[in-house]
């Protein structure tokens, strides 16, 4: 069987690249996978967005017909993560407990409460504006302004709760990395020459990989996130943009995930996302479209923490001096935005091949890279299986 395995290079070591590798290595077909990336789990760089994510399952996709495929990806990921935490899929001791699985994977079930300050598509009566209300477990409309056991944000006009899955993202990335290497993936830490466009990048990736493995390359998966702008056509590159985020990591794990939107300007959002098993929680945040600033905005930092205090979003974490949060770190990251949504498809030029190998793109997932990861990766597997 090994002799018939098709060799796939995956360019990119973030959530999309790692999950694509895992999906290829666990599908019914035989694939040989090489992960080629500048950064892998454990690295710290603003160019490496995945470890900087807040990390919980909450679909950002609306009801438009054009987003049906992304809705399916998100639903598939929720299903897979639930099975993983329930011990129904994945590698692990058959006697391991839920707590063991949380520690190993970095995933964990948490109740999530979402609040809105303005009416919109998502605040339709009975939750009809949220396509995923029948996908998640425990979905319930909250009666505002009073709820059973907590006071909602002062300006909230609509709220829900459901069983979400929160992510200790550094641990989850390490888990995926260990799984794909256990299953036989090779990893090469190197940067590809992007000075000659797509042809040059594919050619250089092949050169790097074939230097230590002479087996022929069947396909390359471009899972480079925002870095794809350096190798795709000018027209395609113009569709890619950063969505800057800034978050604060604080001590303690919040009891639940909380989100509050539409309470201020278009850029400000408030969320609290515990990182299961880490003893820490992410507090955010913002969505600053087109902002490439790397430095921490101290004013925004203060606003993030003040909003969390004012709206009572994480009272159990106010264990610092004067009832404040105990800050561990502050981080800035660029979500990989793309006009038109994620691009998961075979290359449109040259009949789908570049320098003699099939090229499949998988980038542009914006702030939905984690919740779409399994479904998106399985779409890549489907594309490759049809070649």
Annotate the PLM regions.
Residues 53-151:
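Dinucleotide-binding Rossmann-like beta1-alpha1 core, especially the glycine-rich loop
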Residues 16, 41, 227:
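Conserved Rossmann-like nucleotide-cofactor binding loop
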Residues 19, 48, 198-303, 315-320:
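Flavin-dependent oxidoreductases
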Residues 65-80, 159-175, 295-300, 373:
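Short beta-strand to alpha-helix junction loop
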Residues 2-16:
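Beta1/beta-strand and adjacent pyrophosphate-binding region of the FAD-binding site
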Residues 152, 156-219, 223, 232:
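Helical element adjacent to the flavin cofactor pocket in flavoenzyme catalytic cores
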